[in-house]
């Protein structure tokens, strides 16, 4: 059987291993708990690439429309009563924990608390470490940008599905509070420079590879201040920024000092994000597959099946998808099948 859940990190970062399946380049996209992340074998140092990401990626702008096939099946709404949501949407603790925030220039900033209190553990969804089933983690990105899609993601999906919040959304704390009330862990999307910036612009306060350390940290502080209650961050776009260890190091050092974890969306095979996080002993996870490059029921289900295969083979797998109505419905249907 398979379980939708985050696999928790060991308390000792040296024991953490980053899960990297054998790369199979078949599709394209530049985007977007506590998870077991496994140290890369030395011979795989140049193989950090999502299964369905190409060697080079044309990045859509932040408001681009995902590819929709002409054969797309009309979406149908999932009957929430069929999802046993009450069993999965156990409320998480209210945020913020006053010991984990400080007042910054633009709002509350995450900080480490006393006695080892850290955000990626405190805000995490509870986890049964004795469950040895293969684990699938899914992160739905772009939450907070669209009211209908954000509501559907929060209310329709099981609590084990994590949500990635855009720093550009309105009323983000309200969305965060609603999502935690339904059991969802949250990540904050951090816009990072793509190779063809500014033609493709992730948005204001994008982290830039050639900017000064001070400028990037000021931008990062603005982004982190837009909402509180997330366990970590995920890079949005970033094929240029994430390929620069020099640019990444001060940013990840700051994030690690705040008790946050990292998801490397791996929008490019040249991403150094997870590798740099490992060097800094930062909790981290690596995207294995983009689920909804092509938004059709058939293709989304095919990608989910491939994610299952990865989890069965390696013990855990992580996939990213966007908060579109069809994607949300298909992931909800798929999650039902795992419990059957």
Predicted regions and their residues:
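Active-site beta->alpha N-cap acidic-glycine motif
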Residues: 115-201
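Juxtamembrane proline-rich low-complexity "stalk" or linker regions positioned immediately after a signal peptide
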Residues: 6-111
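Conserved, mostly hydrophobic/aromatic
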Residues: 141, 233, 318
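Glycine-rich phosphate-binding "P-loop"
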Residues: 108-112, 133-140, 236, 291-295
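Catalytic domains of cell-wall/extracellular-matrix polysaccharide-remodeling enzymes
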Residues: 210-301, 312, 322-339
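Hydrophobic membrane-insertion alpha-helices, especially the h-region
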Residues: 1-5
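Extracytoplasmic/secreted cell-surface and envelope-processing proteins
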Residues: 18-20, 147-150, 172-174, 196-200, ...
